[in-house]
Regions:
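Short alpha-helical segments enriched in small residues
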Residues: 1-127
Length: 127
């Protein structure tokens, strides 16, 4: 309940700032599986500034749908700031009505983590 309330407050503040700047937002999500877009959409008035979202849970969708270079994933790792930024830029390029993008990539678990990137690791980008 506390997490839900905090997310609602953050989303409302985010929306107020977006409206003040006449901004429009698109999301690109991996480990959150649409949770960010869902939280934003639950905010009254979100239709004025939320353009939509991309859920790219699998690596292949990051490449195919958002244009994240395979070489970047190979060199930086799929859970990296560089890949999160590439996801955000890809979503923005494919959503011409958006002025900003929010992206996240990570390891949700319960398996799939490594010593370098344990379960619970996430990386975000806003462009």
């Amino acid at each position: 309940m506390l997490w839900s309330k905090a997310l609602s407050v953050l989303s409302a503040e985010f929306g107020l700032r977006a409206l003040k700047k006449n901004a429009a937002v698109v999301t690109a999500e991996s480990c959150t599986a649409g949770g960010i877009a869902n939280a934003i959409a639950a905010t009254p008035g979100a239709s004025a500034w939320l353009k939509g979202g991309w859920v790219t849970y699998q690596t292949s969708q990051k490449i195919d749908w958002l244009g994240v270079p395979e070489e970047l994933i190979a060199s930086e790792g799929v859970v990296s700031e560089a890949v999160a930024e590439a996801m955000a830029r890809g979503a923005l390029a494919r959503t011409p009505t958006a002025s900003h993008a929010v992206a996240t990539t990570g390891v949700a678990g319960p398996s799939g983590g490594t010593d370098d990137t344990p379960v619970g690791t996430d990386r975000k980008s806003v462009v």
